[in-house]
Swiss-Prot record:
Name assigned to this protein: Lung adenoma susceptibility protein 2 homolog
Keyword Magnesium: no
Compartments in which it is found: Secreted
Keywords carried by this UniProt record: Phosphoprotein, Secreted, Signal
Function noted in UniProt: Might play a role in cell proliferation.
Phosphoserine: residues bearing it: S161
Signal peptide interval: 1-31
Amino acid sequence: MAKSKTKHRLCSRESSVSSLLASCSLSDSNSSNSDGSYHYKDKLYRSASQALQAYIDDFDLSQMYPGTSTGKINIDEDFTNMSQFCNYIYKPNNAFENLDHKKHSNFISCRRQTINDIDSMSLTTDDLLRLPADGSFSYTYVGPSHRTNKKNKKCHGRLGSSDVEKNPNFQGPSTPVGDKIELLILKAKRNLEQCTEELPKSMKKDDSPCSLDKLEAERSWENIPVTFKSPIPVNSDDSPQQTSRAKSATGVLEDFLNNDNQSCTLSGGKHHGPVEALKQMLFNLQAVQERFNQNKATEPKEEIKQVSEDDFSKLQLKERQF
């Protein structure tokens, strides 16, 4: 019953480690240990994943039944593999150097530097079992030769970029990616130079007409010439009423023309569309009609005043005669 329960628990999603081990194939050539073997509770396992799976089963049983206990996985293999694994991790591309015990102890007093955190490493099951129980790693430091190599690489990279700009056929000690970047930069510069040379001369000149002027010239339907009739001269023999009416009419026309010129200057000389032009003409005509009506209303009052003054003068003359 206990075994069936553990199998059911292994298949469930409650145990994340067991589900990961069940879903991932850990028995490939990289994670398997062909040279050594693994002992767990008097049983021999060929791969570390099988031994770890048995340990997980016992751990699940110990969580369900307190009487059961887990054992210890023993590795029948020399410790040289562990040192090879450490060298493989801490010497990528031969960039780091190992020191003997005296140099190592002297450097620890000055500075300690680890390469990567344990959680950020990608380790297989065999590597995890080879790690020490306390999880400690040996300290390494960046050697002076590595620093000088970096400086030399930077200097070579700078010289390569300057030489490529001067001479396109120059081949410096740079990486293929750097060569591609330099070639792309040179191509972009050449394309820009060709584009500037192919620009039309009319666009470079300062005397070229503006685009707004060209558009206004093309929109000839808006530039309709407006003609105004010249005012009719008024004879001096006419009555004062006719002269006052003519003066009011000419004044209204002058005001209309002045308002039109002001609106053109305020709008910046821009031509309006046909609908807007019609609206403005209607508004101006309404304003002219209102002013004309006001002048008509004021004219009879002036005539009445003139008649009353004439009558009063006539009455005074009659009284003097009598």
